[in-house]
């Protein structure tokens, strides 16, 4: 017995290799669908969305968590690319900038057709898998991107948006964000306002996944109660393990379980360990916890790569997903549970959202009350009591008569 002590490290290495080999085999059949990647923001920040810039070559892009070789090494088969614009665009140029971020995602697919396939459905994801491409979908990160307009919501859907985060780190006029729970923002909607409920219903009608990352706990509960389809948290972790208000508390995880919804675990150190440093094992702890509380069907990956300043040791970039999967296998996750976390759980939710959609239903039309909007940079067409030039003949004159009478001496 004592003579074989020198074999122990070799046995440990072989066991580790065994789990990673199994992870690779699984991921060759079931590549990961990640819920949130901010590469489009980096393309704006570094290159002003100019993909022809030599430095923006996605095959050799440096200083980012994401490039094509890293995606291939990580067995990434599906990616929700974030069409993110900051909160300071709210009530200003949020819609314009969101359109530009959707455009750069679409141009990524056009520039690298051998790697990316822009798709808009669960069927499209499966087809991209078969072709060995990265199924590329648009997630709009923040309800401020629709400028409180159901019409803009519908337009973004037609441009390919398949999930929308109800808020970023700021309230919209119709939904409260996570900073309400820290006391840094004041609650405006107590979760969702009447118009916020209309947004959720219209997303259900269209077949857009409702994303509750970044929202307040009251907004989480309101949306989970109201939605007629499962929802997602595209990049959030477990509050019980790291009490950061961007994470999901256990009582909400119970609602996730009851509604067949999904939490895609974030890799940002501050949400994993509540400190500047974290490691791969701690990310696996979050996956374990969500599995324990909400069930294996409620777990996914939402790394938040290229949207955060620090990531865990062992998960330095998108190439490292197989190492995390190997850790789950070491923790005795079954192959079916691993395949669920990689892709099958997201596909199930997406298919349920598609099935719950009803394009034959009349679209939502009731606008948000003008008084709920910041009005300094907007017109009031449609809200105005001023006479319309498009009234029936005679109506304009009739509406002016009281004004003329008031002007008489």
UniProtKB/Swiss-Prot annotation:
Domain of life: Eukaryota
CC cofactor: Zn(2+)
Residues of the propeptide: 385-409
Keyword Zinc-finger: no
Outcome reported for the amino acid change (mutating residue 242 to A): Does not affect dimerization. Does not affect dipeptidase activity
Record: residues binding Zn(2+) 2: 141, 214, 235
Keywords carried by this UniProt record: Cell membrane, Cell projection, Dipeptidase, Disulfide bond, Glycoprotein, GPI-anchor, Hydrolase, Lipid metabolism, Lipoprotein, Membrane, Metal-binding, Metalloprotease, Protease, Signal, Zinc
Effect of residue 285 to A: Does not affect dipeptidase activity
Annotated EC: 3.4.13.19, 3.5.2.6
Gene3D superfamilies the UniProt entry points to: Metal-dependent hydrolases
Major subcellular location class: membrane
Enzyme class at the top of the EC tree: hydrolase
Quaternary assembly: Homodimer; disulfide-linked.
Protein's recorded name: Dipeptidase 1
Species whose genome carries this gene: Sus scrofa (Pig)
Upper lineage: Eukaryota, Metazoa, Chordata, Craniata, Vertebrata
């Amino acid at each position: 017995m004592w003579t074989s002590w020198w074999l122990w490290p070799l046995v440990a290495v072989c066991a580790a290799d065994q789990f990673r080999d199994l992870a690779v085999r699984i991921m060759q059949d079931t590549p990961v669908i990640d819920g949130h990647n901010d590469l489009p923001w980096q393309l704006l920040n570094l290159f002003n969305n100019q993909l022809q810039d030599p430095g923006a070559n996605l095959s050799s892009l440096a200083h980012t968590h994401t490039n094509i070789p890293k995606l291939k090494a990580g067995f990434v088969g599906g990616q929700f690319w974030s069409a993110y614009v900051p909160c300071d665009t709210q009530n200003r140029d949020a819609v314009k900038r969101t359109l530009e971020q959707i455009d750069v995602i679409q141009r990524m697919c056009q520039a690298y057709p051998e790697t990316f396939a822009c798709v808009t459905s669960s069927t499209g994801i499966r087809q991209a898998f078969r072709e060995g491409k990265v199924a590329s979908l648009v997630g709009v990160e923040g309800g401020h991107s629709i400028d409180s307009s159901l019409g803009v919501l519908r337009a973004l859907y037609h441009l390919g948006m398949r999930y929308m985060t109800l808020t970023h780190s700021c309230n919209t006029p119709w939904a409260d964000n996570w900073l309400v729970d820290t006391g840094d923002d004041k609650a405006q909607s107590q979760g969702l306002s009447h118009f916020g409920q209309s947004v959720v219903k219209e997303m259900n009608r269209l077949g857009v996944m409702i994303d509750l990352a970044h929202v307040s706990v009251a907004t989480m509960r309101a949306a989970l109660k109201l939605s007629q389809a499962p929802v997602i948290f595209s990049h959030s972790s477990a509050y019980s393990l790291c009490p950061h208000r961007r994470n999901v508390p256990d009582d909400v995880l119970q609602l996730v379980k009851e509604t067949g919804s999904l939490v895609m675990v974030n890799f940002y150190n501050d949400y994993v360990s509540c400190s500047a440093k974290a490691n791969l094992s701690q990310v696996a702890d979050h996956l374990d916890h969500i599995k324990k509380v909400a069930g294996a069907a409620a777990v996914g990956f939402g790394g938040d790569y290229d949207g955060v300043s620090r990531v865990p040791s062992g998960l330095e970039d998108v190439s490292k997903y197989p190492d995390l999967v190997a850790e789950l296998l070491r923790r005795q996750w079954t192959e079916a549970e691993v395949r669920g976390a990689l892709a099958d759980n997201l596909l199930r939710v997406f298919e349920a959202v598609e099935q719950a959609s009803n394009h034959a239903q009349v679209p939502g039309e009731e606008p948000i009350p003008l008084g709920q909007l910041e009005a300094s940079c907007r017109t009031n067409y449609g809200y105005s009591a001023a006479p319309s030039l498009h009234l029936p003949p005679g109506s304009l004159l009739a509406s002016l008569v009281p004004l003329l009478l008031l002007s008489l001496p």
